[in-house]
Amino acid sequence: MNQKQKNIIERKTKDFCEEVKHLKLTEENKRIFNAFVYKRSKPYKFEIIDKYSNTIRFILCTNKLDDGVLHILLKHYQGKIGSVSATEILNLCEVIRNGEISVKENTMVYTLKQNGQIFKLIVALKKSKT
């Protein structure tokens, strides 16, 4: 990661905190918030049941530029491509819970239409060790 990217991430992290400081967060929201603010080296793990009764286990990486927290901060939060707010990020699990599902190659794409906006969340498929 270059210095310009580090500066952008630092600024956007501060903006993210400011945007949600007035909200009452659920436990799930707090975990997502922590992933975006504290960026620990271990990924954050989530388990959600979608509307099709599929149990979706996914990780939210905090140290990779091509997916997870850094990708969302650099490309989508306050961005021009697929722009999302901090509140929308905190509710990303709702896209899985309530969205329509499509499978493309090694990914599942959840799409949720809400308040005139379309939210997409891409989950990479990996074989379970269990």
Residue ranges and their predicted role:
Residues 1-130:
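Ribonuclease/tRNase effector modules and their secretory precursors
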